[in-house]
Amino acid sequence: MDQDIKTVIQYPVGATEFDIPFDYLSRKFVRVSLVADDNRRLLSNITEYRYVSKTRVKLLVETTGFDRVEIRRFTSASERVVDFSDGSVLRAADLNVSQLQSAHIAEEARDSALMAMPQDDAGNLDARNRRIVRLAPGIDGTDAINKNQLDTTLGEAGGILSDMKDLEGEIHDYIEKFADDTSVVRGVAWVYNLGSANGGENVITINKPTRTYAVPYIEVNGSRQEVGYHYQFDLNTQSISLVKPLEKGDFLMAMTTESSVPLESMLASAAGASSVGKLGGGTVQDFITNTESKFGSFSVLEDFGPVGTPEDTAATLLSSLSSGKPIVLTRMYSLPMRTFSIPSGTTLIGLGAKTGFKAAGGTELFVNLLEVGGTDVLLSNFAITMDAAGRGSVGSVACYGVHFLASSRGNRAQGLKITGKAVGSTVGFTHGVRCNGVRNVVDKCDIQYCSMGITLRGEYHKITNNYLNNHYVDENLGPWTAASMFWDGITGEGCINCEISGNISEYNGQSGIYFGGNNSLSQGLIITNNICRYNYNRGCDTGISGTASDTNNVIDVTYSSNILENNRETNLWLFGVSESTLIGNHIRETALYDTLFPNQASTTRAGLALGGLTCNNNEIVGNNIRVRSTTPFGIVLNGTGHYLAANRRIGGASNYIFASDNQRLVGNSIERYTGSFTPTLVGTAGINVTSATGRYEIQRNVLTVEINMTLSANGATGAIAIGYIPGLSSVTPVMRDIKVTLLNGWLPALGDKTILAREGTSNDLLNLVVFSYGNQSNEVAQYVGPASSLRITATFNTSATL
């Protein structure tokens, strides 16, 4: 039997283009995925990969976290490629396609069977060294068991703790509860039967060395149960009577109020770990020792020295960083405004926004408060406050909160709250995070009052789920100038294959997101699912400075599914950018715009704009553009080679694409653009135009025109030429499907003669001719009466190559 898998292939990551080795009937039957042993991501055509040819695809996304690219054919069994109807003509090609679809479905079914869990030669099921997932718990003695059952059997109780920070925090909580009352201990957790019920129990007894006075509530498998409704507590017997019996394996935790015993004795007792809500029993020290052996020990900063003055804290921080241990920050520490270098492998974790560092003083510029030049550094869950007190400028930065240097690789700033202004002070020129190097991550950071929130340069960075606001707009700081301390939320130059997604950037002094050349090359950027609103300049601003070249350019950028709202100037702006895709973005102006920017000139406003002569070959598809009535354009179009399709536009001026008709028709490929014009008579004497209207539609390089005119004359002679047809002045059109309809009012002398339209003396003119019995004449004016109406419809193909 043929055992080859023919409809699925996996390639190792590392390349960007991959062959499709099988035939298929439709691209929608081909699925491209990124695959790892424990993860799978199905990619979307156009936005995450595209077809280079019928047999080859190109990835548009980063493959970090995955080791294989899978291409699979999955032919629909319900969506027929060919649908036969009674009475129709059967063609061999249709029958072949229908038979091929059935063959593809059968071939894919065979491959699925081969890829499932087969039997070996002895009849045993063979997992072929792969994990078996979603395995139900075993019941009978011969059943397979899953890892959770094994962990419970071995006493690991389902994963006790992720790190020492949780343990320390919970112990502190219980210490505070002990300190509240010297006679009674409140809020002590007790876990029944080491965290796993036997099953069937409806009465359980609290067997603790201290007397329990009350049980305010219990939790069963994380579901809170209320006293008097779900259970009763008997003080005399120290028992809990449940309305619903426990099931086997249930986790029951009771929150108790009990008599006090010395804290040291309780924590050192055999039930000490259980007393603070941990499974498995044993003393707290036993639990700490066991956890350290699994996860490594954490230390608090104070373990390494005094933290009273900024200089004390500086020395202690340096000492802790040289220890090689993960450091926990338990409060806000004052530091001098100077650079602190973080070694590779350091983990620096806070306990939230009320822990971290506040730096002030000094006169130095270009301070890197937390400087990372190596690898595998984690900065997580703490605050940084920089008090630069008005120092610095855009070219002389006072301080960077976190600076990943060009030598850095694979570091992470996560959950940081970074503020560029101390209470009562003024803003100096600061960057929240400066991200250079390769494959660094800035995630879920809250960055406010920094001149620039996040700035980046390098390769494969991920800037995700951050909040950026320097409060220039919402605090009404006046007209912006280049000397301002308030710039963009996210700024990138010289960025390759970076992802900027899920960020909110608002109220900034310049743009929400800016990427530019500035003598550098940026390409392969994925900018998606961001919200950029209320910014003083633009929502998303991408462009080059100076002359475009191989080393000074912005190319191959994908803007998708972003929300760009009420930004002062153009919401989505590309200047000199080429080979890029703008798809599915939501651009809107609301009544709030007039409140935020009441005096803004309409000439600087548009929903989406492409500018510059080097702005070429971009795709603008499926964008939703809603602008105010005072905004003149939904789309501004400069450059050539662009493809525009399925963009929805509401509001603004009627001429929603600002461009010449020649640009719309010839220089670019535009789907279903409609417009109007006023036709005139050219070089014709003795005839008056009573009324004239013209409508046209551009569908790529095809122009469809309808002209309606009413003419009046008395004894006129000569030819009639009508112009000017939009977009045709500089091209040689091929006219087809032309029709002249004489509506009424033509003189009887016309008789059975026919009036036709022919190409005029220039590309954008039509000449009317009289045709009769094979003879053609230009003498048409003699048949025009006091009110002669006609309609002309025509279709033109341009000869230009798009």
From Swiss-Prot:
SMART domains with a match to the protein in the record: PbH1
Cysteine disulfide partners in this protein: none
Entry superkingdom: Viruses
Gene3D superfamilies membership: Single-stranded right-handed beta-helix, Pectin lyase-like
Principal place of residence: virion
Keywords: Degradation of host capsule during virus entry, Degradation of host cell envelope components during virus entry, Host-virus interaction, Viral attachment to host adhesion receptor, Viral attachment to host cell, Viral tail protein, Virion, Virus entry into host cell
GO BP, sorted A to Z: adhesion receptor-mediated virion attachment to host cell; symbiont entry into host cell via disruption of host cell envelope; symbiont entry into host cell via disruption of host cell glycocalyx
Localization of this protein: Virion
Any one cellular-component term (Gene Ontology): virus tail
Known function: Functions as a receptor binding protein (RBP) and probably mediates the attachment to the host capsular exopolysaccharides. Displays a depolymerase activity that specifically degrades the KL47-type polysaccharides of Klebsiella pneumoniae capsule, which allows the phage to reach the host cell membrane and bind the entry receptor.
Annotated domain remarks: The N-terminus anchors the RBP to the virion. The central part and C-terminus probably binds and degrades the host exopolysaccharides.
Self-association state and partner proteins as the record states: Homotrimer.
Family: In the N-terminal section; belongs to the Teseptimavirus fiber family.
Name of the featured protein: Depolymerase, capsule KL47-specific
Lineage of the organism: Viruses, Duplodnaviria, Heunggongvirae, Uroviricota, Caudoviricetes
